Structure formats: structure tokens, C-alpha cells
Amino acid sequence: MLYKQYHLTILFEMKKYLTTLFLSFAMFSFAQQTPAVKDTIAKGATKTDTTEKPEKTPEEKRAEEYAKLIKKGGLERNGLFTVRKIDDKWYFEVADSLLNRYLLCVTRLKTAPQQFGMYAGEKINEQTLFFQQKNEKTLILRSYLNTQVADSTNNIYTAVTNSSSNPVVATFNVIGRNPQNKNQLIEVTDFFKQDNSVTGLLSKLKTDKKIGAIVAAQSFVDDLRAYPMNVEVQTLKTYGASPSNIPDANRVGAISFELNTSIVLLPKVPMQKRLFDSRVGFFATRFIKFSDDQQRTQTESYIHRFRLEPRKEDVNKYLSGQLVEPKKQIVFYIDPATPKQWQKYLILGVNDWNVAFEKAGFKNAIVAKEWPNDPAMSLEDARFNVIRYLPSEISNAYGPNIADPRSGEIIECHVGWYHNVMKLLQEWYLIQVGAVDKRARNLKLDEALMGDLIRFVSSHEIGHCLGLRHNMGASSQTPVEKLRDKKWVEAHGHTVSIMDYARFNYVAQPEDNIGTKGLYPRIGDYDKWAIEWGYRYYGNRYKNEFDEQEALAATTTQRLTANPHLWFGGEGRGEDPRAQTEDLSDNVMKANTYALKNLRYVVSNLHEWMKEPNDKYDYLSSMHKSAVLQYNRYLNHVLKHIGSRYIGVIGSAEVYQPVPKEIVKEAIAYVDAQLFEAPLWLYPQAITNKIGSNVEKEIADMQNNALNIMLNNVVLYKLYTQSLASPKAYLLDEYLADVFAAVWKPLNNSEVQQNALRRGLQRSYLAKIDDLINPKEQATTAANSNGAASASSTAVGNSDVRLYALQHLDKIADYLKTAQQQEAQPLNKLHYQQLLKEIEHIKEPKK
């Protein structure tokens, strides 16, 4: 109280002419003195302080609110965010240094309901997020979207920024600040517990599965764990689901999931982008580039790839051409739920990629390991690359990657490996190479053989994880006769890329004595080139990604010119018949003729090889369906050549060229010999009398489908326009004459089934011509089923295609008149007579 008494004494001794107003002001000044008063009261002084206390600063208030909550105790975990659990609520402490830092947020199923169609480990949501300070009381969470960019030194940068607002996905009240480090405390319980666009099921998934609103009372935040670079959140979420197309959910009216959400801090400085080149097949993120010196906008894409760099001390060695180990190895872990006998083969499939990375200058760049017994590690953690084993009847596997949207740097991969992929592998192997490898001819493949097949699929899926797209054109770079050359094919493989769907060498014949090195796919020359192109490190050689792009483009041109086998043919969805799924060689007509020799042998022996105990025929039925499917693949490979064109490397002299006439003629000859001459061998009685196939219907459907392509109005229009553009092209009337010759053959009275199918084929043919002359619907504007380029209905309708069809109808009529006069068999004669009547109706259709 000494300070207070001294102050009053000074006031008493002041001159008496001081006014009352001045005295009042002095007393107010006294009331502002706080430290000693507070200390005294805090020590239990009995005198009551009636003076007005000063208002606390916002910083003091936040510190007080923080202390008030923290003194309750509870759980504390330090990491990227300090995670706290107090009572039944969860909190983050967010450092100011993490504001506006990008966070990868990935939510995966930890457990999944039965018959949901997705499995534990599969991704259900992915976002890139960042916290932003709205004001001192509020943090907002935004989702980062990156579709257009501009250099910050350009004037247009401001316009681009103002037109690229990122959506707010959550808002958090700031409870207080940690007085020591100034971290902001926010409650996150409801954010993770409730449904939202960041950590919940996506709207499309809920719509597809008929999942309703979240049931809050039956949803929980189970755990939050903090690590230096990430936070892992485990939740249990229950949704209403009535009615639902998920049987169990429909019965109880609800469906529950355990989810794991990984929040991972992305690099402060993004990896330098590598810009996409359409001549090398990488997954890529597309963006629109704006700049002040443009006269039109520019679309660019940057590829997805892991950050693979030499250690600082090895940079000079690397740049001088020595192989070095990367600073950070690419590591994949094997799901411990994987059957033990298959784990080593999955590991081998991953490690096989090292041969490609050596072309990029790195040794031991990639490795697969068994999952360690470490409680601090989680399979769902987005920091780890994992091959997840999924208990599913689906016969497949897939290898996605998740990349930093700013740079394309791959952050993590979770391969989905369905248990039943082994069924597909067994079917492929038996049907395609069962004629040359006796090990395939069993109900169950031996472990070593199945392991080899798993290994190649593992390599294929890891290729996707590394950023590689399918290259369906790869197999077309192998000359067909080399596939039967034992020395050559065992040295080089039957395709230049593991990323093609070129399963096994079905061209090899039993007498060729080709071993498994010439039957299995492997990482080939294209794969090595693609990894070299995408992963070679250049240090500071280039100023930015655009300078690098210019240099790499020149290198790519040189390499492709020197070695055309490095051609990237795309995903197999275009019109180029060289880039198809499941095909082999530079001539599929020849390749598939060899393949059918093998398939005939396999089909003729299936009933012996697939014998089951207790006279069951499940395996026989399944394998026969696979054989028919394979036959149709061979057929469709051939049909794709009709009305299509080759699409070459961008920048070459001729990018687009019609498929040569000689090749199309080969295709027609194949269809004539292998389909229009009905393939009754595909349905031996030893099989059909056990599984009940409708032989005539199945073959008739195949024949009709082929005619739908060969006489499709868009296909004919393409041939017509090609003939106008080039004197070497296949003339439309010549093409129709060749197809006619394949269909309109004399009926052989001794072959009852062949006769019946041939009559049906001819009726179908005439119906297609009728459709061309008297179209019931406008020609489609979409690509036809053969993949040929689309044409508008107006263009087709206004062309000469209908005139050619009318001219062709007269040719059919002339043939029928002669045939009916020469035919003695009553049913065949009546067939010709009826077709002539149909032609009259076609020429003069009823209104």
C-alpha cells in the first residue's frame, strides 16, 4: 500500500487553486494502477478493491481461454499439429507457420461392410487443403484447386488470382492461443465426426450406393495420432441406408464404416514440374497457363512422378554418369493380410523396376518389403506405399497414385490387389499358352507358376504407381515371326512394355519350344525409356520447367527417330488399330491365325484337363467361356482395322494415314475364314453336352456383330472419304465386293449346321444393306463400335454411301437370280427366292 499513500500525499500538497475537475481526473488516474492491487488481492487481502480493472488485451484473453481449457488435463500428442483430447472432445493446436501450408488429406476405409463393393484400404476421398486466418477469432479451411496459373511478375497474375478462389470447406473458432508458442487451439470433434466433403463419403458414392444422411448419435471420433509430418484420424461413421442396394444395410436401415483420414504436410517448396510430352505415356495434371505476352491461352500438363534425387554428396557422380542411390528410396510395403506364399512374388514384381531406374541413373531406387511389426505404423497412413490385399471376387488389380497438385510429385500409392485376380490369371494362361506349357493344364496351377503370373501383374500395377499409363501400342512393335523365334523372343520378350495388355505369347507354337522367358511379359525397352525420360535428374541445368521441356522435346524426337519401337500408342481407346488391348505383333491377322491353332488344341482338350471330382463342370464351363471370349478378342483385333487409320508421332511428316488397303483385305480374309465359315470347332460336343451351350445362337450373334461393323454407315463413310483423299486408298465399291465375296458363297448341302448359319448370315447382310438405303434412324454422331472416327449424320446422309449401297443391292439381286436357278435343294432355293422378294421391298419400301 506504500505506493498508494505516496500518491495521495502529492495530491494534498498541490496548490489550492486546482479545480475539482482536476482532482477528479487525478483520482481516475489512480484507479488505473493495477499490478500491485491484483497481487494483493490474489494474496488474500481483506480490503475490497472498488477500482475499475483494465480491459484485457485480445492476446491476454486468448491465453486465458487456452489456460482455462488446458488445466482440465487430458491427452496430449505432439506432431504436425499438437493433438489434445479433453473430456470427450478433440483439439488441434495449429502453429502460425502452418497457415497457408498445403496439406494432403486422404480418407480410406479401415473396415467396410459386406457386399459394399469397396474394401478396407481403398480410398474414398482425397483433397488438398490449407488453413487460413480469417480473423483473430476464426480459422478457415480451404480446398486447394489448381487449374490455371500465371507468373507473379505478370500483370495478368492479379486477374488469374482473383478468378481462382478456393472454396471454404470448414470454419473453426479459435478458442485460445498457447502462450508459449502462440499456437491456435481449435476444436475438431464435429469436423471429423460429421459428414463433410473432405473426410466423408463423396456425394457420388452415396448416391450410387443409396446411402442417406449421417447418424450423429452412432458416429464417433475414435482416435487422433500425431506424427512430425502428419496426423492420422480414425472415425466410425454411421449413415442411414433405407432403401439401399447393399443387402445388409437394407435389412437394418443403416450402414457403418471405420475410416482413416491422413493429413500430410506437403513440401513448402514444390518439386520442379516436368511438363508432359504426349509421346511418352505418363499420368499428368492439366492446367491453363496465362501470361502477358500471349496472344492465346496455353494448355500445359505436368507429369506425376516420385521425387527421386541423388544425395548432395553424390550429385557430381550422378551428373558424370555414375549410378548412385537416391536420397529417398521408393518403398512399397506388402499388406500382412496377403497370403504368405504370394508375398515374395509381389516383392519381386516391385523390385524388377530397378532395371529401368538404372537407365535414369539410379541404383536401388525402388524396393518392396514385408510390413514391419511396428505399432506406430498404419496401413492406411498416407506416408506409406502399400500393396493392399482385398478379399473380393473381382478378378483384377489396380495401381493408382496420389500426387501433389502443385507439382505432380507422387506422395503415396495404395495398390488394390483383389484376391480373385488369380482366377483371371489362370484362365489367361491356360487359354493363351496351354498348348505350349503343360503346367497350365490343371485345375490348380502350381505355386511357382502362379507366383510368376502374380509377379508380372505386380510389375504392371507398380508401373502405374510410378506414373506410367498403359501403352497399348507396345506389342505392335514386335514382328509377328519374331514371336516364334525362340532365341530372339526369349532375349527381348514378346512386347516392349509391361504397361501393355499383352498378357502372354499366344503366337508361339508347341514345335517352337519357347520357354517362359519368351511367354511372360517383362519390363521392356519402352518402360526403360519412359522411366529415364520421367526420372532423370538434371540439377540446375535448366532455369525452369519450360526450358527443360524444350530440351527434353528435342531429346525425345532424336530417340524416337533412332528407335521407333519406343512409340507410345496410348490407352487403346482411339481408332489406331495398332494400339489395342490384348493383341500381339505388327500383324494381328497372322498372329491370330497362329493363336487359333493353339486355341483349337486347348478347346479340344478342355473336357479332359478340367475334370472335377463328383462329375462337376464348374471349371469346364468357366474355361470354355474364357475360350469363347478369347476367340472374340482375336476377331475384334482384326475388325478394328476396317475404316480406321494409323496415328503417328506428332511432328512426323504424316501423322494420320489410312490403314493400307492390303491390310484391310487381310482382315476381310480372316473374318471370312475364321467366322463366316462358322467356327463349330469352338463348341465340341464333349463340352456342349455338359454345359448346355446354344451353339447356333452364339455363332450367329458373332457373325451379326461382325457385319454390324463391316457394313456400318460410319465405317463405310470413312472408307469413302479416304478414297477421295488418296488414289491408293481402298475404293468403297471394291471393299463392298470383297465383303460380298466372303458372305455370298454357295450352300453346301452336306453341312447342315454350316448351311443354316450361312443362310442366317446372308439374311443379316441384306438387312444391313436395307439399313444403309432406308435408314430407320439417323446415323450416329458417336464413334462406332469399331472405334473409327465419328462422322455427323448429315455428312453421312449427304455422301454417296447410299448410292454405293443401291448399286451393291443390284449385285446381290443378280447373284440371287443365278443361285436360285442353279439350286436344287428346296430349302436353299426358297431362301434365295425370299431374299429376292426382300430386295423388292428395299427398293420400294412401304410408306
Per-region residue spans from a language model:
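Bacterial Sec-dependent N-terminal signal peptides
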Residues: 1-36
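Auxiliary tRNA-acceptor-end handling modules of aminoacyl-tRNA synthetases
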Residues: 35-338, 356, 365, 371-424, ...
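Solvent-exposed, polar/charged alpha-helical surfaces in well-ordered, non-transmembrane soluble domains
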Residues: 64, 344-351, 355, 456, ...
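The catalytic-center signature of Zn2+-dependent metalloproteases
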Residues: 370-390, 452-509
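Conserved catalytic/binding loops enriched for acidic/polar residues
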Residues: 475-847
